[in-house]
A protein has these predicted regions:
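N-terminal signal peptide c-region/cleavage motif recognized by signal peptidases
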Residues: 9-13
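Amphipathic alpha-helical repeat scaffolds of TPR domains
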Residues: 85-87, 91, 98-135, 161-173
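Flexible helix-coil transition and linker loops at the boundaries of alpha-helical arrays
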Residues: 106-119, 149-161, 196-203
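Compositionally biased, proline/threonine/alanine/serine-rich low-complexity intrinsically disordered stretches
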Residues: 230-299
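N-terminal cysteine/histidine-rich coordination modules
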Residues: 15-89
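"A position-specific structural signal for the A-helix of alpha-solenoid helical repeats
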Residues: 127, 169, 209-213, 217
């Protein structure tokens, strides 16, 4: 390593997002190509819909085969899966999606083709909503809401922390679409359940964050505010003494990150970039249901 490179590396800020060029072989069609791939990122906070905020792209960018547009979301596929994916990717329908839809919306369609678990498809749709344009947003949220509602039905009797956070996402999407009264009713019903539903070694911290976010949602609803909003950080040092403050990018490790709900997306600061890209995309599809921070980046 040259001295200039070494000095530049040593001087790089801790909150870094890095990219590197990686060689790939497309699982569908065998095309060889290189792509700029995100290798690391740092999270400072999260939005109420789970999208990470910081020196990171959220959702984690998917690598795309330039020829046919296949998205690399797993390291390996079964023979039947490759046959089904190959036929779909070559179809006019999929090629049309390349010009009209986001990468995670297309990922959701690929997951549907191979009959992936419903939680994987739901996670892809959640991330698609983070990418959506103003025109796409209502349609994307409607699809994500329907997928998540099947994972955490309102009438579910076996409730836990994952059910709670999934319900919080449904309320967030209702608010974002200006459906304020259903959102208000949902959050008012959820708030008294937080302490009982959140379990685990970090339950006090997680429950405090969930309760703060629900209170924040109710304030936004009272104000008729449907905008995308940073979540409060109920566990920041100042918040511990003064209570919840307006949403800020203060503490990367926030509530639902510790709740172990299956929406976590991996993005460490050091890793082989090719493996990182494949793992991150696979985790985005595989582990999706509900983690308020969506776990992307350094902690």
């Amino acid at each position: 390593m040259g001295l200039g490179v070494l000095l530049a590396t040593l001087a790089a800020p801790a909150a870094a997002m890095t990219f590197m060029t990686v060689e790939y072989v497309c699982p569908v069609g065998g095309e060889r190509f290189s792509a700029s791939t995100m290798g690391s990122g740092t999270v400072f906070g999260h939005f109420l819909d789970g999208r990470a905020h910081g020196a990171i792209q959220s959702p984690w960018p998917l690598v795309e085969c330039p020829g046919n547009g296949f998205l690399l979301f797993r390291e390996t596929f079964g023979k039947a899966e490759l046959e089904a994916l190959g036929a779909y990717v070559q179809s006019d329908d999929y090629q049309r999606l390349r010009t009209t839809e986001t990468s995670y919306w297309r990922l959701a369609q690929l997951l549907r083709v191979i009959d992936a678990p419903a939680v994987e498809q739901a996670g892809a749709l959640q991330r698609a909503s983070w990418q959506a344009s103003r025109a796409q947003y209502p349609r994307y949220v409607a699809a994500a809401s329907a997928a998540f509602a099947r994972q955490c039905p309102d009438g579910e009797t076996a409730r836990d922390g994952q059910w709670l956070y999934c319900q919080m996402l449904l309320g967030e999407w209702e608010r974002r679409l200006s459906r304020f009264e259903p959102a208000r009713a949902r959050f008012n019903a959820l708030l008294p359940q937080v302490a009982a539903l959140v379990t685990g070694p970090d339950r006090e911290r997680v429950a405090r964050q969930y309760a703060a976010e629900i209170a924040q949602q109710l304030e936004l609803i009272d104000a008729g505010d449907s905008r995308s909003t940073m979540a409060v950080d109920a566990n920041a040092p100042a918040a511990a003494a003064a209570g919840p403050a307006p949403g800020s990018a203060a503490d990367a490790a926030s509530a639902a990150d510790a709740s172990a709900s299956p929406v976590e997306m991996v993005a460490g600061t050091t890793a082989d970039a090719a493996s990182m890209a494949a793992d991150a995309a696979a985790d985005a599809a595989r582990e999706a249901n509900a983690d308020a921070l969506a776990g992307e980046g350094d902690r």
